[in-house]
């Protein structure tokens, strides 16, 4: 949202200082300066006058008629020039009207004009004050005025004191004054607005500003650039720092000025940070946290990484996650925990007190879980610190595998990964979760254009080489079922996968050339990068893996081989909760899920609970792991661990 005060033909915004503070040096000087009369012929427009847009002939003529009838009601403000001349800093329209009367021989060139003479160093400020109070002052004029005063050596604070503006507003206008001349010319000619200029001001390099401006004009309707396109072109390799959990965790001090881009014109005065630099800084801090935990808790090794250790093929070959031992509470902790739970249950609504109670209970639980890891366990294991769902994820009891371990543990791994029978899952839940899974696979595939291209090519080859060539050019059809998928998936349109898909769609739609739907040749002008992005997105949207059940038999998910090919993990896009999953299961299924995840202690506790409480219990204990129901993920490859399994034909 624009916060500038200089947009043409809009009300003055709040950056003006209150009226009581507007008694500036200039106004005080003008109040003390006596009027004098000088001949009309000695007056010219001051070179320091910020007015650049010509006065309309009609307005000058109307003012001339008024002066003819009642005389000059307001004096002009001038400064001395060489040769007994005076430059008009405030009152340019009145000077134009007087000259019009002289041209009509209504007054003489020596007609006495009432003026106040001020020092030359205050001339620009006088012009700014005169025009700044007028509704028709053009933004380009205000920008030029601020720049002129800055070139005189005045600081933003001094300029603000002279004119009654806040220093912040002056800084913003001076930022616009640094734009490339061609852009300021476009503003003066009303081909763009201050909003366009604010977006372009994100880039400091004037050559790059012009490049972005021209590209936005070419892609805009009728040559009119779109503010969003400008902003996207400048920040395409960056992310906003506002509400960014990674940036908040790392901190601004972790970046150099070149890696941060400040947006002076945003409401929160935020900005952008380079994606690569942000991830590098995040990884460095995660490693530092891991080192601290290794020393403090006595683990053999540690690692900081971007993703948690999961069950994908690469991680399963390198790591083994030990089952989490049951928490070990001291007698004092158990008494305190019971007391806190009683106080928490007594509260009817969530409030500050309930948040404090929950935080203390979580701290006690965390300490008990850490204590459960014995020195023997820690001596042969490590701690991995990663980033997940906007928070730090700590995995303790991670062991490094040797090559022999992969073979020796094959049978045990299969037992852990043994799928629950999909036939035991209700059909409504099967539809819901396979829809959720489909959206997640779409979002993951969208991020891997090379795999999308391979999948599309394979699909086309099935038709071409299997059924003969088409009789018409490019008989390709694509059915996007986002409406039904979001209707069935528990997360609906609020899920991480669907929101990622829609964000990419919004990014791509502004890159489509004008008239593209009527003329395919418009796509010939697109870069290979844009074409590949469009192709990848459209291919991803065609993925459909909703399972059905007929005659008591559940269809096999077509997503299994594709997930293996792209290294997909459902928990990157979905978090099981009571509302979206556990609440739809029977109590024995909830207990089985906890056991399958290696949480045998939590499973035993769930046996004593009602179904609703067991569902909440499962949500709490599953939030920090990577468990996915066996029937919702691709089976682990049965071949040798070193054999490649990402065959692109199988992927489709």
Swiss-Prot record:
<feature type="compositionally biased region" description="Basic and acidic residues">
    <location>
        <begin position="1"/>
        <end position="13"/>
    </location>
</feature>
<dbReference type="InterPro" id="IPR036086">
    <property type="entry name" value="ParB/Sulfiredoxin_sf"/>
</dbReference>
<protein>
    <recommendedName>
        <fullName>Uncharacterized protein YubM</fullName>
    </recommendedName>
</protein>
<dbReference type="InterPro" id="IPR004437">
    <property type="entry name" value="ParB/RepB/Spo0J"/>
</dbReference>
<comment type="similarity">
    <text>Belongs to the ParB family.</text>
</comment>
<dbReference type="InterPro" id="IPR050336">
    <property type="entry name" value="Chromosome_partition/occlusion"/>
</dbReference>
<dbReference type="Pfam" id="PF02195">
    <property type="entry name" value="ParBc"/>
</dbReference>
<feature type="region of interest" description="Disordered">
    <location>
        <begin position="1"/>
        <end position="21"/>
    </location>
</feature>
<dbReference type="GO" id="GO:0003677">
    <property type="term" value="F:DNA binding"/>
</dbReference>
<keyword id="KW-0614">Plasmid</keyword>
<dbReference type="InterPro" id="IPR003115">
    <property type="entry name" value="ParB/Sulfiredoxin_dom"/>
</dbReference>
């Amino acid at each position: 949202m624009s916060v500038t005060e200089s947009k043409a033909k809009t009300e003055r915004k709040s950056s003006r200082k209150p009226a009581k503070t507007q008694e500036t040096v200039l106004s005080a000087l003008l109040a003390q300066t006596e009027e004098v009369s000088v001949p009309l012929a000695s007056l010219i427009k001051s070179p320091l006058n910020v007015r650049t847009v010509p006065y309309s002939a009609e307005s000058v003529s109307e003012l001339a008629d008024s002066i003819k009838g009642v005389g000059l009601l307001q004096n002009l403000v001038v400064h001395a020039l060489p040769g007994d001349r005076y430059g008009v800093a405030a009152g340019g329209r009145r000077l134009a009207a007087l000259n019009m009367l002289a041209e009509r021989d209504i007054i003489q060139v020596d007609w006495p004009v009432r003026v106040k003479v001020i020092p030359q160093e205050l001339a620009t400020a006088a012009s700014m004050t005169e025009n700044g109070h007028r509704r028709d002052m053009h933004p380009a004029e205000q920008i030029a005025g601020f720049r002129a005063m800055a070139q005189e050596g005045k600081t933003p604070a001094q300029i603000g004191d002279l004119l009654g503006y806040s220093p912040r507003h002056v800084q913003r206008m001076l930022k616009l004054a640094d734009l490339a001349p061609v852009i300021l010319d476009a503003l003066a000619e009303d081909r763009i607005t201050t909003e366009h200029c604010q977006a372009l001001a994100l880039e400091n390099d004037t050559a790059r500003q012009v490049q972005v401006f021209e590209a936005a004009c070419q892609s805009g309707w009728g040559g009119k650039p779109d503010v969003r396109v400008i902003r996207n072109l400048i920040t395409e390799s960056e992310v906003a720092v506002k509400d960014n959990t990674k940036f908040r965790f790392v901190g601004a001090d972790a970046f150099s000025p070149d890696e941060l881009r400040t947006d002076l014109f945003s409401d929160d005065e935020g900005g952008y940070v380079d994606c690569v630099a942000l991830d590098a800084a995040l990884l460095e801090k995660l490693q530092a946290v891991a080192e601290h935990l290794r020393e403090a808790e006595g683990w053999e090794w540690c690692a900081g990484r971007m993703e948690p250790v999961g069950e994908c093929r690469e991680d399963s070959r390198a790591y083994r996650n030990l089952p989490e031992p049951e928490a070990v509470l001291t007698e004092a902790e158990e008494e305190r925990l019971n007391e806190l739970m009683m106080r928490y249950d007594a509260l009817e609504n969530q409030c500050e007190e309930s948040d404090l109670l929950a935080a203390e209970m979580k701290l006690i639980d965390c300490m008990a879980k850490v204590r459960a890891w014995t020195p023997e366990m820690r001596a042969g294991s490590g701690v991995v610190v990663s980033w997940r769902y906007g928070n730090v994820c700590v995995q303790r009891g991670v062991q490094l595998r040797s090559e022999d371990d992969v073979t020796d543990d094959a049978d045990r791994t299969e037992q852990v990964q043994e799928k629950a029978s999909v036939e035991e899952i209700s059909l409504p839940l099967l539809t819901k979760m396979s829809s959720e899974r489909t959206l997640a696979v779409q979002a993951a595939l969208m991020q891997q254009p090379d795999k999308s291209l391979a999948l599309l090519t394979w699909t086309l080859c099935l038709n071409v080489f299997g059924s003969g060539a088409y009789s018409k050019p490019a008989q390709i059809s694509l059915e996007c079922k986002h409406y039904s998928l979001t209707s069935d998936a528990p997360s609906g349109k609020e899920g991480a996968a669907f929101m990622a898909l829609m964000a990419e769609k919004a990014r791509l739609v502004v890159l489509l050339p004008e008239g593209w739907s009527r003329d395919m040749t418009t796509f010939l002008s697109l870069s290979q990068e844009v074409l590949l992005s469009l192709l990848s997105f459209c291919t991803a949207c065609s993925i459909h893996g909703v399972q059905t059940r007929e005659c008591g038999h559940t269809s096999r998910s077509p997503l299994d081989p594709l997930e293996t090919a792209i290294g997909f993990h459902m928990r990157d896009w979905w978090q099981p909760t009571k509302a979206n999953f556990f609440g739809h299961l029977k109590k024995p299924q909830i207990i089985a899920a906890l056991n399958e995840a290696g949480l045998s202690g939590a499973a035993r506790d769930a046996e004593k609970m009602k179904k609703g409480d067991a569902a909440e219990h499962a949500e709490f204990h599953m939030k920090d792991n990577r468990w996915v129901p066996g029937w919702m993920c691709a089976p682990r490859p049965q071949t040798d661990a070193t054999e490649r399994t990402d065959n692109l034909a199988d992927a489709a």
